Amino acid sequence: MKTLKQLIFFTAIALFSVSSCQSGNTNKNEVNTAGIGNKIQGDTLILIETPYGNMKIKLYDQTPKHKANFIKLAKEGYYNGLLFHRVINQFMIQGGDPDSKNAPAGKMLGNGGPAYEIDAEFNDSLFHKKGVIAAAREGDDVNPQKKSSGSQFYIVQGRTFTDEELDKLEEKSSVGNYIASHPEINKEAANYRMTGNKPAFNKLIENIKKKGDFKIAKIPDYKRTIYKTIGGTPHLDNNYTVFGELIEGLDVIDKIAALKTDKNDRPIENVKMTIKVIVE
């Protein structure tokens, strides 16, 4: 069963899920290409305490709605005692569901949150390198505006990619975006998916690649460098709002992501969090 706020895996057969890799006109100097962030005077810093160590996060000024909301919830103690309820090795660790507080073992989580969502705040200079924090959300089928959950978030672990893998991702993402932006083609693709007609779907993909208005959106070189060295989850770029990054505690992500989980990706051993604002 698909839960609300559940992050989407992108596979070859799910090309009609939007996953943009457009380069835009980003200034490289705006991006920290070293991977893990550095504190700059005036940054808002958040501390996430866990049984496996602490993570210190700086929140981005470029995403003011998400920044203000996270600060508000942290100050209210909203996150204290909640779980990292969904962890997937080489992908991410997810938390912030209020239903996870004192949840019995085995309970499926991921549907909880405050009674509001946050408008997406995409910024091409903020992308899914290892160590960023981003907002979870409902899927595109019920949330085409990609609004964020009011409380649920995930921290990226990801993995490193080769140039060949990134080339394939560019093509898949570009095809997915093309399908999503053409309603009739989107409807046709959805029909093939529902009926399991893989040959027809594959033929549709090949025809799209031959269209004169189809272009592959390239991943900029500075992002490629990070995805090849530091790692991350490039297929999520411009689909989920990235609103901060770790400046300490990358090893904590790895420890939590490596835990044994149940069939719903919930750690067998509860991983509770405490979140506080330490510099504002």
Residue ranges and their predicted role:
Residues 1-31:
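Bacterial Sec-dependent N-terminal signal peptides
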Residues 21-280:
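Cyclophilin-like peptidyl-prolyl cis-trans isomerases
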